[in-house]
């Protein structure tokens, strides 16, 4: 195989290579003969379709597929021959002839000695208590609460139905009429100054509040201004929580309505949530230590930029889902994510290097356990497991996640570590 490599930057390489034309023609010919034996075409007996007819009908597709497969195979072979470790996907361009190609890509930087025993890691621990289960049951009661209108003044926990309008200088919002809505006091849904101003209001009572909106407030006409907000309490209602009886318990999928089974199910769910939260804490802790120890290592620029653009895309999607216009996000906004992206790339490459150097292998048992854990959150867990097993993309994502967790655990076990005991609530507050 003809292949040459050159450095075009600290971490960028250019590989020029030529596809073996004979192998391509052999593969194409073999595939066409196979199609001639198996393809049914009107006017010809099975297995008797002339190769020329097959080539006219399928030749272009077969050649394109063969070229793509051979291109990847030849590139991978050249990469192995030159002992290159790629960081990200290559860009492959056509060369001077149909069989010449030029691949441009970035390589993993040299991290030198990776001694994880020098890292200092704080490993959080926590457990689910009966008090945590009691709190979750109370939260479930709040989810199923009903509302009873009252004549007294509004207090924290009450639902207040509102009519509002604002005066910002000479501008009235809305220009005519009022805006209607409702809010549970203490929920933090409304701006804090407005929410506190509603406390004590009775049904039908009106009030004018002076509110200082921050510069980044979501309504441009109010952002950074001191505004007169006129509010009217249309109705004040207090919450009525359901009793924890059999019907209540059955509504959460416990068919027997048994209180002990209900608590056992809640414990299982909370322990699953806690396990994920503790791993996220450990992932962040190990990541921060790796960043501090290897921040001096240059990262592949294109890989970092791609990560920054991916982070921006996630933010744009969040903006869209919130009902705001994603078009307001500047085209170069990814620049603001470059530092965070560089850290993500650094940790990702280091985790990969630790796995490679220490010959860590994906544990199939851990993959199965994680899959069962994910599936257990759905009503039909077996269907979820089957869906993952039949979807290579989903399964690859799961395996990558499990492999990362294995490496994080491996690093934490060998680093200098101290344990930090947390309550359940503190532990899940990541």
UniProtKB/Swiss-Prot annotation:
Keyword Nucleotidyltransferase assigned: no
Chief subcellular location: cytoplasm
Entry EC no(s): 5.2.1.8
InterPro entries for the chain: PPIase_dom_sf, Trig_fac, Trigger_fac_C, Trigger_fac_C_sf, Trigger_fac_ribosome-bd_bac, Trigger_fac_ribosome-bd_sf, Trigger_fact/SurA_dom_sf
Keyword Transmembrane helix belongs to the record: no
Cell compartment(s), UniProt: Cytoplasm
First-level EC class: isomerase
Biological process, per Gene Ontology: 'de novo' cotranslational protein folding; cell division; chaperone-mediated protein folding; protein transport; protein unfolding
Gene Ontology cellular component terms for the protein in this record: cytoplasm
Annotated keywords: Cell cycle, Cell division, Chaperone, Cytoplasm, Isomerase, Rotamase
UniProt domain PPIase FKBP-type: residue ranges: 157-242
Catalytic reactions on record: [protein]-peptidylproline (omega=180) = [protein]-peptidylproline (omega=0)
Molecular function per GO: peptidyl-prolyl cis-trans isomerase activity; protein folding chaperone; ribosome binding
The protein's role, per its UniProt record: Involved in protein export. Acts as a chaperone by maintaining the newly synthesized protein in an open conformation. Functions as a peptidyl-prolyl cis-trans isomerase.
Similarity section: Belongs to the FKBP-type PPIase family. Tig subfamily.
NCBIfam families: tig (TIGR00115)
Domain notes from UniProt: Consists of 3 domains; the N-terminus binds the ribosome, the middle domain has PPIase activity, while the C-terminus has intrinsic chaperone activity on its own.
Protein name: Trigger factor
Source organism per UniProt: Xanthomonas euvesicatoria pv. vesicatoria (strain 85-10)
Gene: tig
């Amino acid at each position: 195989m003809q292949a040459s490599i050159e450095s075009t930057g600290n971490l960028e390489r250019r590989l020029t290579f030529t596809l073996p034309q004979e192998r391509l023609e052999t593969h194409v010919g073999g595939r066409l003969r196979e199609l001639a034996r198996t393809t049914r075409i009107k006017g010809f007996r099975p297995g008797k379709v002339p190769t020329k007819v097959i080539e006219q009908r399928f030749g272009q597709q077969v050649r394109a597929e063969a070229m793509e497969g051979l291109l990847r195979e030849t590139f991978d072979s050249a990469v192995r021959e030159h002992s290159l470790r790629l960081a990200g996907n290559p860009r492959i361009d056509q060369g001077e002839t149909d069989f010449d190609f030029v691949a441009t890509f970035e390589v993993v930087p040299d991290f030198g000695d990776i001694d994880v025993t020098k890292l200092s890691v704080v490993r959080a621990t926590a457990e689910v208590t009966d008090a945590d289960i009691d709190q979750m049951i109370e939260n479930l009661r709040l989810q199923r609460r009903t509302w009873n209108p009252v004549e007294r003044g509004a207090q924290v926990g009450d639902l207040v139905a509102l009519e509002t309008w604002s005066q910002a200088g000479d501008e009235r919002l809305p220009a005519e009429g009022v805006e209607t809505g409702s809010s549970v006091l203490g929920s933090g849904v409304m701006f804090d100054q407005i929410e506190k101003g509603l406390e004590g209001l009775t049904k039908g009572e009106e009030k004018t509040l002076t509110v200082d909106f921050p510069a980044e407030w979501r309504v441009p006409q109010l952002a950074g201004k001191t505004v007169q907000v006129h509010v009217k309490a249309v109705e004040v209602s207090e919450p009525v929580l359901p009793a924890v009886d059999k019907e209540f318990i059955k509504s959460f999928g416990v068919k027997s309505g048994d209180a002990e089974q209900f608590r056992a199910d809640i414990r299982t769910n909370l322990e699953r949530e806690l396990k994920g939260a503790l791993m996220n804490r450990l992932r962040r802790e190990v990541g921060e230590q790796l960043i501090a120890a290897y921040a001096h290592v240059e990262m592949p620029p294109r890989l970092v930029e791609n990560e920054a653009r991916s982070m921006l895309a996630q933010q744009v999607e969040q903006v869209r889902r919130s009902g705001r216009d994603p078009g307001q996000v500047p085209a170069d906004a990814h620049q603001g994510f470059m530092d965070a992206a560089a850290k993500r790339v650094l940790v990702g490459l280091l985790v990969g290097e630790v796995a490679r150097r220490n010959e860590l292998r994906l544990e199939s048992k851990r993959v199965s356990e994680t899959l069962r854990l994910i599936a257990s959150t759905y009503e039909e867990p077996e269907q979820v497991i089957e869906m993952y097993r039949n979807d290579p993309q989903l399964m690859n994502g799961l395996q990558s996640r499990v492999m990362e967790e294995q490496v994080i655990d491996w690093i934490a076990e060998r680093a200098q570590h101290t344990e930090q005991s947390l309550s359940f609530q503190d532990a899940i507050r990541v």
